[in-house]
């Protein structure tokens, strides 16, 4: 289905020959070398794995079904399939997480040599099981989370990962192109239920309901035109996230 979807997009939309085409996957679903090779032949050239932690106990605590052994297996499969651009997502501030567990996770992920690493502070989203359990869990306090973040910044830099945005680190030449489009406030188009776009001076999002989306009619759940003040404010806020900062001109 993914290969068919990509072929359809290529037919309908102009796609640059050197486009970065990322597939996001859970580690437990990215261990099939044959399937990964088919995806690479179809045009996918970057894999992003939702690793989150190298500690199996923490993974269970946040409801993840993969283990770190499966992460290692997935990395081996991704490399065997020929992918040269691999990203991994990590989360700090997990319930019960210690500094030692975070240090071990950073070390374990560096040992797998991905080209890109994202480190996100835990965000409790309403409607999720972890949000519902928030009062019964013990989370690292703000100071502990700050220490975890600064540790990642320091150690990743020591291992050749350049920080180009608050949460993102990459080997030279491997900064995520689609991430940079957001931070630089460039246009992007989203497809699918709930997808957001910022295109032609208008921002819009499709409805989340699948049946409504596939009805074939253009249904927007929200839309707003550009406002100079809003754009200026967002430029400042987004630029402050990047290593480049604000252009004072």
Question: Where are the regions a protein language model picked out?
Answer:
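C-terminal scaffold of the Radical SAM
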Residues: 1-249
């Amino acid at each position: 289905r993914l290969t068919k979807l990509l072929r359809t997009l290529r037919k309908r939309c102009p796609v640059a020959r050197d486009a970065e085409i990322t597939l996001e996957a859970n580690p437990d679903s990215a261990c099939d070398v044959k399937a990964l090779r088919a995806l690479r032949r179809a045009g996918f050239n970057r894999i992003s794995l939702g690793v989150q932690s190298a500690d199996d106990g923490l993974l269970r605590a946040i409801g993840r079904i993969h283990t770190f052994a499966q992460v290692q297996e997935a990395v081996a499969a991704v490399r065997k399939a020929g992918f040269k651009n691999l990203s991994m997502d990590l989360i700090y501030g997990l319930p019960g997480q210690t500094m030692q567990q975070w240090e071990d996770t950073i070390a374990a992920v560096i040992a797998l040599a991905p080209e890109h690493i994202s480190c996100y502070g835990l965000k409790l989203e309403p409607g999720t099981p972890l949000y519902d359990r928030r009062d019964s869990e013990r989370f690292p306090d703000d100071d502990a989370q700050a220490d975890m973040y600064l540790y990642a910044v320091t150690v990743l830099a020591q291992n050749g990962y350049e920080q180009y945005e608050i949460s993102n680190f990459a080997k030279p030449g491997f900064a995520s192109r689609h991430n940079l489009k957001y931070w630089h406030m460039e246009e992007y188009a989203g497809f699918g239920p709930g997808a957001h776009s910022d295109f032609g001076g208008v921002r819009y999002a499709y409805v989340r309901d699948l049946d409504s989306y596939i009805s074939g009619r253009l249904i927007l759940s929200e839309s707003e035109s550009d406002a100079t003040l809003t754009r200026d404010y967002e430029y400042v806020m987004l630029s402050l996230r990047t290593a480049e900062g604000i252009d004072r001109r």
